[in-house]
């Protein structure tokens, strides 16, 4: 994991859940270093950990590397988050006993398109597609590609039209780069040509928002993921209308539940969860939630840590998580 606020929340919740189960948990942040990720996992396996929850492994090496770890340490249980398994030919693979966890990325994308359609009900139903400037980078990050699937469903049926797809040119400075690209692009369109802007990632969205403010534009925008900076921008009551996200505290508990059930050999209880995808096998997806500008503005001093104070009930819903008798007794729910 990278040591961002949402993963700090994840880590805290994971540790609290582990303690409730009578286990101890340690967190190691690799801060987006592929080498550190592999070295840390190798070291943890050598140190005798019973289970590992690993996040954001690279698609070009995760399957081969983790396959080697499970072969060398057959008693070690592993669950992954946002980590796709593909071989050198690009074909999807599985690792026996390893459950893969993801956000419901296509759902995050679709929920945001629905938000945009709700802003233009007459156009969406009668006048033709809603014209969208899409901030997206395909074939770059697996999660972005999964989000594209949910977005394209609406394009296929003619509800939206993508005017153009843009992305930052400098990934080391994504916010400022995205601002420059967005300003340059938006200037090329006449007023009213762009109905809305859909962003695949909130860091890119921050640049877009700053571009819109610099241009004095009232084009509405939405984005995937959320952080305190996004919330502050939404609280201004201007262009940023909604974020699609998941509850990162619940995500930490969820990951610990899955790994604990793996360690107990209770795969049937994992498969019984409503978020388990039987057709994909050993695959679970966290339901998406939309946080709107109206919700943010209805509260005071809202941050990602107290977001539940203004979000709807789906944000704190836990009915989709795997469970069993001893788990319910330990957690009280």
Predicted feature descriptions by range:
Residues 1-17, 21, 26-41, 49, ...:
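Extracytoplasmic "Venus flytrap"
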Residues 5-23, 108-112, 142-162, 177, ...:
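Short, solvent-exposed amphipathic alpha-helices that sit
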Residues 19-31, 131-134, 154-175:
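Short beta-strand elements in bilobed, periplasmic/extracellular small-molecule ligand-binding domains
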Residues 64-107, 127-131, 228-240:
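Flexible loop/hinge segments that line or gate small-molecule binding clefts
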Residues 196, 210-287, 291-297:
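Exported/periplasmic ABC-transporter solute-binding proteins
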């Amino acid at each position: 994991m990278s040591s961002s606020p949402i993963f700090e929340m994840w880590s805290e919740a994971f540790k609290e859940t582990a303690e409730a189960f009578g286990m101890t948990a340690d967190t190691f942040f690799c801060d987006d270093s592929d080498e550190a990720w592999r070295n840390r996992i190798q070291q943890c396996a050598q140190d005798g950990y019973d289970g590992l929850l690993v996040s954001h492994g690279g698609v070009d090496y995760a399957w081969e590397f983790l396959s080697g770890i499970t072969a060398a340490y057959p008693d070690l249980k592993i669950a992954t988050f946002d980590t796709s398994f593909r071989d050198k030919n690009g074909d999807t693979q599985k690792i026996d006993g390893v459950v893969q966890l993801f956000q419901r990325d296509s759902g995050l994308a679709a929920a945001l398109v629905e938000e945009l359609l709700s802003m233009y009900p007459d156009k969406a139903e009668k006048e033709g597609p809603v014209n969208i400037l899409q901030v997206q980078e395909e074939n770059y990050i697996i999660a972005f590609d999964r989000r594209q699937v949910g977005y394209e469903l609406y394009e296929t049926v003619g509800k939206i039209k993508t005017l153009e797809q843009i992305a930052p040119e400098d990934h080391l400075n994504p916010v400022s780069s995205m601002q420059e690209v967005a300003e340059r692009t938006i200037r090329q369109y006449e007023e009213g040509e762009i109905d809305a802007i859909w962003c695949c990632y909130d860091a890119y969205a921050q640049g877009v928002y700053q571009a819109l403010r610099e241009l004095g534009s009232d084009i509405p925008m939405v984005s995937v993921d959320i952080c305190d900076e996004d919330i502050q921008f939404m609280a201004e009551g201007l262009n940023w209308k909604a974020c699609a996200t998941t509850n990162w505290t619940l995500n930490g508990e969820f990951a610990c539940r899955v790994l604990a059930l793996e360690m107990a050999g209770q795969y049937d209880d994992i498969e019984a969860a409503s978020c388990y995808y039987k057709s994909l096998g050993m695959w679970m997806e966290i339901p998406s939630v939309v946080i709107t500008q109206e919700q943010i503005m209805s509260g005071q001093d809202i941050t990602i840590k107290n977001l539940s104070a203004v979000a709807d009930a789906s944000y704190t819903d836990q009915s989709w998580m795997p469970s069993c008798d001893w788990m319910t007794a330990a957690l009280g729910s």
